[in-house]
């Protein structure tokens, strides 16, 4: 059997997922390919139809389609249900199943940065929902969309608060692309930081990771997060466990 996986979203050209999954397939002794599919919402729906028809073994989903993916699933794991967001899809029988390997990765990342009492969530999309599903303390949101922030408050009642009320020492959780083009997070955020979970990745460290490391703060960077998320997706699709270290090494080597 040859597996066929793909990452769907826009943008996807920068993704390191193909390198990670090729490494996982090789270590597991499995045949397969991992593709990148840039798509708009209508094209994504067509891709899900192809998944259901058996043309793909599994899909990863990235921005901006994680919420749409959630609505297209027949069944979902507890993690996806908690997050109201799906980043991993497969077919069992004739039904589409959704999972959030983001939630799994956030649970580990939160422990790795010292199990903080509060976090400052940067962004309001699907990854942000996964962070909220994984963390059970107060969450202070810094986002551009008041509508999306209000949606988070409705989904997670009593858990979401305005950034202005956030205490110093909160862990920053960056679920936006800020940093991918070499830009630093705003000073108002850094002033509150007691640690950092930084999802963006690019060539080397993002400025936020360099800043946090230089200030002696606990950090989980985008490569580490992506590797745990990818290993979880691979196991959910294939039933084979491949260590995140294999994925992380492949990601850092491009």
Per-region residue spans from a language model:
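Rossmann-fold NAD(P)-binding glycine/threonine-rich loop
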Residues: 197-244, 248-250
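Rossmann-like adenosine-cofactor binding region
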Residues: 156-220
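Conserved beta-strand positions in the Rossmann-like core of class I SAM-dependent methyltransferases
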Residues: 35, 140, 220
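NAD(P)-binding Rossmann-fold cofactor-contacting core
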Residues: 137-156
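Phosphate/diphosphate ligand-binding glycine-rich loop within oxidoreductases
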Residues: 2-113, 203, 215
